[in-house]
A protein has these predicted regions:
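Active-site core segments that coordinate phosphate-bearing ligands/cofactors
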Residues: 1-46, 51, 56-74, 95-259
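A conserved helix-loop-beta module that forms one wall/lid of the active-site cleft
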Residues: 73-88
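Short beta-strand to alpha-helix junction loop
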Residues: 59-61, 86-90
Length: 259
């Protein structure tokens, strides 16, 4: 098992089973968002290896659903939907979805994956050693690994990448920082001029030099960080000079700290 965080599907499902058993008993199949969207489009329920791995349900070593995890939590195997390849026909747009969305009925649904595997796909990141990075609500560094291994301290997540197969190991190792988007929001509310937009913040930040004239901001201010062994170290601002720095330096330093 290469994922063990409490904020992923398997652990959430275990919480529902223990705390809301009446709801749990109504479950037919478990789905990730991509599975649910495909179901609404086609009326069919299926999933992928990549999706199951993001939910913590995949046994990478044996290339199958993690029976040991299902047994540990007391999940029935019937909860797992039929598994389809990531790139394959996974259903077709039905009449209801076609009418509502203006799509052609019968259009094949041929791909699905989670947010970070999708981001890596869009950046042409497929092979061991290649890395994709993104900053939004959270900041993510997602690197492709060609071997089945793991971090014993659980500081990172491991997913089956979109091109992972039995014959070709391609695992996405994900490092996540919680405090990126909220840092930008905090700076807008508390540091930037009142009423400024995010685009105007970008313009203001561009007036500061690369490196923000020596200010550095570490965006660890949104709770515990798994990459730091679940420590809450808080955000820190370093190198601030009251005689030399202005709002534009701080805004740029926050953005540089995020990326």
């Amino acid at each position: 098992m290469l994922n063990s965080p409490g904020n992923f599907t398997a652990s959430k499902l275990a919480w529902i089973k223990e705390n809301e058993p009446a709801i749990y008993e109504q479950i037919d199949k478990i789905m990730l968002p991509g599975d649910y969207i495909a179901m609404k489009l086609s009326g069919e329920i299926c999933t992928t290896v990549s999706g199951l791995s993001e939910g913590m349900f995949w046994d990478f070593k044996n290339n199958r659903v993690a029976d040991f995890l299902m047994d540990y939590y007391g999940f029935d195997s019937s909860l797992i939907a039929d598994i389809k390849p990531t790139f394959a026909e996974q259903g077709r747009v039905n009449a209801i979805a076609a009418k509502e969305l203006g799509l052609k009925e019968g259009t094949p649904i041929t791909y699905r994956a989670g947010d970070q595997p999708n981001n890596a796909l869009s950046l042409n990141v497929f092979n061991p050693g290649e890395i994709a990075s993104t900053a939004g609500t959270s900041g993510v560094v997602y690197g492709v690994n060609g071997e089945v291994n793991y971090d014993p301290q659980s500081r990172v997540n491991t997913f089956a990448h979109v091109n992972h197969t039995i014959d070709q190991t391609r695992l996405g190792v994900l490092l996540c920082i919680n405090g990126t988007g909220i840092l930008n929001s905090w700076v807008k509310r508390n540091i930037a001029p009142e009423g400024i937009s995010y685009n105007e913040m970008n313009v203001l930040a561009s007036k500061a030099p690369i490196g923000s004239a020596g200010i550095s901001i570490l965006p660890f201010g949104n709770g515990a960080e798994r990459m730091l062994n679940n420590k809450e170290i808080g955000c820190s601002i370093r190198g601030l000079d009251f005689n030399a720095h202005g709002k534009h330096h701080i805004i740029r330093a926050a953005q540089e700290g995020i990326v």
